């Protein structure tokens, strides 16, 4: 038995368009006045007037989430708040998303913010996620966006200090809907069409093979020119054959003559229009004594990839509040979600979809992927797998046929989740009330992964995994709030709280490989011998308790001072951790005479100290599972060979402490021109001290490393939020809104440690490197002299450096959005354009497709004179003239006038033109070469993130069909247009999902654009 390591990532969200508001001057879209009654929800789930806040917070109303049409809260918040960076893993149904607020704050821990729903912390974990496998979900996707009343993003340390070691990455505070006075019923239905928004283009001129000649089962597409063939394959009728399930026969090819290019047909085998139905029903009621909100929803999505790609989420919610008497109020918030999905294999994965699809030669037809192989003697092999590397299916293919990946492999996830929050509020004094809140968040996830016999690679003999993950968090929260009068001009609100939390994750399951019965689907461990069975289990738990106090001073209703302090104890470190904060807001216009130019102004400053708790159990030296990996996504499990565990070579540290983040923030919120223009400015800088690392120690200690508080990081940045009321009248309103965020991150100190691997491969990875931004791209570089010029070989080609180093930065220079919304009579509209500039990405797919001769640039041609051809050489040192004389029509040919036309291109690296052809791209110039620097690409983008239109039908129409509350219809488009220089898929992607490693593309599944049509009835 082995102990399976779980990757647990606490993930998160952002902010929405037509409902955005920066705390301060009440700058919600469509608002042109200072609403002194506007409230925001604080880190502990209570409310506070936005005027009195001295730190940055962004707010979105629930309708802004729903109008986006996204399945998940995270995705719905994209583009709506400054310095809130959200990256979707892929376009797969239910795929998770990474959220980062004001840069990265830890190396070994999670950079995802804390999620608080109705005052209790909940999980947004994403278990799994690596360079291969399937894209994982974020557990925040279990929430129905239609149930949400508002979302607040607390960015800085001062805003979130009461959460101590869970607050370094900010806090997302979600408030769900409550019942309202009277009775109302709402039903909405949405139909959506999803399409691939960006694809790799494949060349269709040259066929399978090498050296300009067709070669059966060859990996590459460096073969002959397809158009110059004779038109029909020559078949050996007496040879081996493959008979597809539909009866189509494929014989042994003696000579390739077929001129057909199958790129379009193979593409259509993979992609379709994805379809989604989303239905929501909610009931709201309320009176003076009680209120109730109940909802049911069903999200049913079929992905853009044909086959087993789907996602279905069914939710139910009940929120209830009862005033028992004038002192006691009780309530219950309860949510249930059932999420079932099928995912498609991706990434560095011989069984992955894009790897097999994109590498397929343009002259190979992928249509018939399953059937029976017959030897020349007529001996059959059933359930044979036909692909371009095994065109007769005589053995497991090197790479899966996409049809096999889509239809034969199974990767299911079945999640059941409950979130319960009973709460009681007792007013024990006219100026004091006590809130008692219990939270319980529990989920189970059963994942089944099945590779039938004849899948590619290590799965050739079949494998099956049944994986059960159970996660829960229980919290008990007591809050006492009081109001005090300290004089005629000074008011004080006090809060004292205690919070206990217990979190645990339990994982149990097993794998079976090398199936005994090979010709049947066997989802059972019995179909494997004992030595090929691999059970696993793991358990982790974390306890913490925290006491805190908050003092809010209000001086003359214009100066607002908040002081907080929290003391926390946790099972992951020894001593208590103290996190103080202070914030000050001053309404400048209270002391100035208002003018037409300046309607409102508030200055704010805040500082705070929060932390990141060390990972569980590193205070002790543990035993770990034995295994080994080449660094390219494979893994050798020692438990299969008699060596399951060993004492870790990394020594525990009983003195380990939380990582400490100290942050200072300065800002201003202003309204100009009679409240028509609202602006928010924030500058911040923070320092993270004592980030946890495994630091090398002398071998004489018996260990190679020890956990220590050894690293320092820092962030600094600027945020601008804007809202402009362009037109305001009874029938027509028009508003311009937007935000801009810039963050600069630096790994200041690693205490002499080598660059820390975060994610990726042996050749290219994302790392923490001292003196560079967190997540910097690391890999092989070109050799250069002291002046920076390339060092060339004798033929004029660049050479590889013997040293690896930083080759790119996945972090953007800035990110922002600009929106326009408004209404004309019953018509409402919203347009949101978002941009991300200066970020780089490793285009691993692009590099490998160069190696395979698939990229269009590898099929380009050039013509030179015979004299020039005698002096131009390829990477082997062979002249162009010599290659043409060899007569391979896919390499170079002699024209009637004596000139020579060749496949490839010419490039001058500094010593004259050289010939870039197969021999360059399959060595140093391709994706399997040692120089990753050449595949670092600009991944900047600008997109139409969202376009929505809705129309409320005339009341007479709705009354005629007995819908008194009204009927509205709407349209939403997502990612309708994308402008980017990045080659291949939408650069809003990441190979390793929500991990700390960023900027990696290696056969990632593509992104989507969507068209949604909605109708809503209010009864």
Predicted regions and their residues:
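Short, small/polar-rich motifs associated with maturation and membrane association
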Residues: 1-317, 329-331, 419, 510, ...
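Extracellular/periplasmic, surface-exposed regions of secreted and cell-surface proteins
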Residues: 23, 112, 277, 319-328, ...
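Glycine-rich phosphate/pyrophosphate-binding loops
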Residues: 83, 824-844
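Outer-membrane beta-barrel proteins
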Residues: 127-131, 135-178, 197-205, 210, ...
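C-terminal, active-site-flanking charged/polar segments
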Residues: 173, 178-182, 186, 193-195, ...
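A surface-exposed, glycine/aromatic-enriched loop/edge motif typical of exported proteins
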Residues: 200-246, 337-391, 500-520, 601-635, ...
């Amino acid at each position: 038995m082995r102990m399976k390591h779980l990757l647990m990532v606490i993930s998160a969200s952002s902010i929405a368009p037509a409902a955005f508001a920066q705390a301060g001057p009440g700058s919600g879209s469509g608002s042109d006045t200072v609403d002194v009654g506007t409230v925001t929800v604080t880190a502990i789930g209570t409310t506070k007037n936005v005027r009195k806040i001295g730190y940055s917070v962004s707010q979105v109303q629930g309708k802004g989430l729903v109008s986006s049409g996204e399945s998940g809260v995270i995705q719905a918040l994209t583009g709506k708040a400054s310095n809130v960076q959200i990256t979707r893993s892929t376009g797969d149904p239910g795929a998770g998303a990474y959220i980062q607020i004001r840069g990265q704050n830890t190396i070994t821990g999670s950079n995802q913010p804390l999620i608080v729903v109705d005052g209790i912390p909940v999980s947004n974990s994403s278990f799994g996620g690596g360079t291969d496998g399937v894209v994982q979900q974020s557990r925040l996707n279990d929430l129905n966006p239609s149930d949400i009343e508002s979302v607040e993003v607390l960015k800085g340390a001062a805003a979130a200090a009461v959460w101590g070691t869970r607050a370094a990455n900010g806090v997302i505070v979600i408030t769900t809907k409550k019942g309202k006075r009277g009775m109302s019923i709402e039903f909405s239905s949405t139909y959506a069409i999803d399409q691939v928004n960006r694809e790799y283009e494949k060349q269709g001129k040259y066929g399978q093979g090498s050296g300009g000649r067709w070669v059966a089962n060859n990996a590459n597409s460096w073969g002959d020119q397809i158009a110059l063939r004779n038109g029909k394959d020559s078949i050996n009728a007496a040879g081996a054959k493959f008979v597809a399930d539909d009866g189509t026969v494929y014989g042994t090819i003696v000579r390739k003559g077929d001129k057909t290019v199958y790129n379009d047909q193979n593409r259509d085998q993979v992609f379709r229009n994805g379809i989604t139905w989303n239905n929501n029903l909610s009931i709201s009621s309320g009176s003076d004594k009680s209120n109730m909100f109940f909802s049911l929803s069903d999200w049913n999505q079929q992905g853009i990839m044909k086959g087993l790609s789907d996602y279905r989420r069914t939710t139910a919610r009940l929120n209830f509040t009862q005033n028992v008497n004038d002192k006691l109020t009780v309530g219950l918030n309860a949510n249930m979600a059932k999420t079932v999905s099928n995912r498609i294999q991706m990434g560095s994965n011989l069984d992955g979809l894009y790897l097999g699809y994109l590498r397929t030669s343009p002259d190979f037809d992928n249509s018939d992927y399953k059937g029976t192989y017959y030897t020349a003697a007529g001996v059959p092999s059933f359930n044979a797998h036909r692909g371009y590397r095994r065109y007769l299916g005589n053995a497991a293919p090197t790479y899966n046929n996409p049809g096999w990946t889509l239809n034969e492999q199974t990767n299911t996830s079945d999640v059941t989740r409950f979130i319960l929050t009973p709460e009681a509020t007792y007013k024990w004094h006219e100026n004091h009330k006590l809130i008692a809140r219990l939270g319980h968040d529990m989920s189970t996830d059963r994942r089944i992964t099945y590779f039938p016999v004849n899948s590619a690679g290590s799965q050739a003999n079949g494998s099956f995994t049944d994986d059960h993950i159970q996660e829960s968090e229980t919290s008990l929260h007591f809050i006492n709030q009081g109001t005090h009068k300290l004089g005629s001009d000074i008011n004080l609100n006090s809060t004292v709280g205690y919070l206990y939390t217990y979190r645990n994750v339990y994982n149990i399951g097993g794998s079976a490989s090398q199936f005994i019965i090979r010709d049947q689907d066997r989802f059972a461990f019995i179909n494997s011998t004992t030595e090929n069975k691999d059970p696993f289990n793991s358990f982790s738990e974390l306890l913490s308790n925290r006491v805190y106090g908050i003092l809010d001073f209000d001086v003359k209703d214009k100066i607002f001072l908040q002081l907080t302090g929290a003391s926390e104890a946790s099972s992951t470190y020894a001593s208590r951790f103290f996190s103080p904060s202070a914030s000050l807001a001053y309404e400048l216009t209270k002391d100035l005479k208002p003018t037409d130019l300046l309607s409102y102004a508030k200055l704010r400053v805040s500082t705070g100290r929060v932390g990141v708790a060390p990972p569980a159990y590193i205070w002790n030296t543990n035993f770990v599972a034995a295994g080994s990996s080449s660094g390219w996504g494979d893994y050798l499990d020692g438990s299969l060979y008699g060596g399951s565990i060993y004492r870790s070579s990394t020594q525990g540290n009983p003195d380990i402490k939380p990582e400490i983040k100290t942050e200072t923030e300065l800002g201003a919120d202003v309204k100009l021109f009679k409240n028509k223009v609202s602006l928010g400015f924030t500058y911040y800088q923070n320092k993270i001290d004592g980030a946890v690392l495994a630091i090398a120690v002398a071998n004489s200690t018996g260990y190679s490393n020890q956990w220590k508080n050894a690293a320092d990081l820092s962030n600094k940045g600027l945020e601008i939020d804007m809202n402009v009321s362009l037109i305001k009248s009874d029938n027509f309103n028009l508003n311009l809104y937007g935000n801009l965020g810039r963050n600069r991150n630096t790994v200041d100190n690693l205490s002499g440690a080598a660059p820390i691997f975060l994610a990726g491969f042996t050749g290219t990875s994302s790392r923490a490197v001292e003196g560079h931004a967190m997540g910097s791209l690391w890999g092989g570089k070109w050799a250069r002299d002291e002046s920076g010029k390339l060092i060339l070989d004798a033929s004029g080609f660049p050479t590889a450096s013997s040293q690896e180093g930083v080759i790119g930065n996945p972090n953007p220079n800035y990110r922002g959005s600009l929106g326009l919304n408004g209404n004309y009579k019953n018509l409402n509209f919203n347009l949101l354009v978002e941009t991300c500039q200066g970020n780089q990405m490793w285009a691993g797919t692009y590099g490998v497709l160069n190696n395979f001769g698939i990229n269009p640039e590898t099929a380009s041609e050039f013509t030179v004179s015979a004299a020039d051809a005698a002096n131009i050489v390829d990477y082997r040192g062979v002249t162009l003239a010599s290659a043409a004389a060899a007569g391979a029509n896919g390499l170079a040919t002699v024209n009637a006038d004596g000139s020579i036309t060749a496949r490839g291109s010419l490039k001058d690296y500094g010593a004259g033109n050289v010939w870039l052809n197969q021999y360059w791209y399959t060595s140093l110039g391709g994706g399997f070469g040692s120089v990753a620097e050449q595949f670092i690409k600009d991944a900047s983008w600008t997109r139409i993130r969202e376009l929505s239109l809705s129309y409320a039908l005339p009341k007479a129409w709705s009354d005629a069909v007995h819908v008194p509350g009204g009927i509205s219809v709407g349209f939403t488009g997502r990612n309708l247009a994308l402008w980017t220089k990045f080659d291949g898929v939408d650069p809003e992607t990441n190979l390793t999902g929500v991990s700390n490693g960023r900027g990696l593309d290696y056969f990632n599944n593509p992104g989507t654009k969507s068209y949604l049509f909605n109708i809503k009835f209010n009864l």
